[in-house]
Amino acid sequence: MEASNVALVLPAPSLLTPSSTPSPSGEGMGTESMLLLFDDIWMKLMELAKKLRDIMRSYNVEKQRLAWELQVNVLQTQMKTIDEAFRASMITAGGAMLSGVLTIGLGAVGGETGLIAGQAVGHTAGGVMGLGAGVAQRQSDQDKAIADLQQNGAQSYNKSLTEIMEKATEIMQQIIGVGSSLVTVLAEILRALTR
């Protein structure tokens, strides 16, 4: 990085002062003016680094909050799925018990004809209960699919946020690198001036 490039990017009023030290572009620039320019550039770099640090901190807090809310939402959907599956199982079990009770009850009352009628009524009741269980199971499967989608979305979202944070860290390192380069250039200039 040449000093003239820095001066062109960030002009300072102190560049207008007369000097005995010529710059690479042929204009005069005093040692004090150059030091003030480097100091100004350094201060601006540090301000940018501090702002980026603060943004990264608040971003990280927000990222954690959003990730937590997504995980809670996924958990709630999964709990709903478990409840729906349990309800389907209860309906199926109730249908099987009702079928058995009707078969035994009508069989005891009506003999062989009652047993056949009991089985028919029991199977019909079991079928109706099975239909209700199927509806509940369908709802459970839909809720599970939604929970899986939410889980995948939460993971993808979290990955995207992490990648953004990595980019911000990379930018912070570049700012620090530019600052180090600036210090090196200043040291070289001061060494050249003291010869």
UniProtKB/Swiss-Prot annotation:
Source organism of this protein record: Salmonella typhimurium (strain LT2 / SGSC1412 / ATCC 700720)
Protein name, as recorded: SPI-2 type 3 secretion system translocon protein SctB
Binding partners and assembly: The core secretion machinery of the T3SS is composed of approximately 20 different proteins, including cytoplasmic components, a base, an export apparatus and a needle. This subunit is involved in the formation of a pore, called the translocon, in host membrane. May form a complex with SseB and SseC/SctE2. SseB is required for correct localization of SseD/SctB2 on the bacterial cell surface. Binds to the chaperone SseA.
Main location: secreted
Residue intervals passing through the bilayer: 90-110, 115-135, 170-190
Membrane topology: Multi-pass membrane protein
Family that this chain belongs to: Belongs to the SctB/EspB family.
Domain of life: Bacteria
Any coiled-coil regions, as ranges: 44-80
Keywords: Coiled coil, Host membrane, Membrane, Secreted, Transmembrane, Transmembrane helix, Virulence
Function: Component of the type III secretion system 2 (SPI-2 T3SS), also called injectisome, which is used to inject bacterial effector proteins into eukaryotic host cells. SseC/SctE2 and SseD/SctB2 are inserted into the host membrane where they form a pore and allow the translocation of effector proteins into the cytosol of target cells. Required for the translocation of SPI-2 effector proteins. Required for systemic Salmonella infection of the mouse. Essential for SpvB-induced actin depolymerization in the host cell cytoplasm.
A cellular-component GO term for this protein: extracellular region
InterPro entries listed in its UniProt record: SctB2-like
Record gene name: sctB2
Annotated localization: Secreted; Cell surface; Host membrane
Classification via Pfam families: SctB2
Deletion phenotype: Disruption prevents SpvB-induced F-actin depolymerization in human macrophages without affecting intra-bacterial SpvB protein levels.
Region forming the signal peptide: none
One biological process term in Gene Ontology: protein secretion by the type III secretion system
